[in-house]
């Protein structure tokens, strides 16, 4: 094989690797629609928002969507007999272009968003749909924080720095920890669990 052909082959491979690395990633997030000024934080409206979050290779949001209408399906399940009003508020959120507020934001940007609380809307809430606004923010954060936390957990330690016995413990903590993170409902729970898992990994003895 000529040097020219080899060079072309390496160039094409490099392009493919770069393109794959820069390909957008779609994450999934969900959060219960909850909270009421008179009833408190534990009040639930009987449905969950279920959204997709597309991010670029830097973790910046490209798009938040619910193209499969999973939230509407959750509303239709009508576990508390409030489907009609829930559907109206969700429609108001969508018509208020709530998803567009997340374009180009990072995890930290989303955390800083002020959607307020049902009954006391913030500047980033969709008017008349504060509960939905809060739930979407929580769902977006759940998706982003879960993805980031799993990546941090997997890459937190280098297995080559441990003897075989400790390597096995490392792999076990990561495997079980990842499974646990995926069961958690809120981004706060995920962040707390990741910190605890890091402590377990820090306790392992290196070579």
Predicted regions and their residues:
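Bacterial N-terminal signal peptides
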Residues: 10-19
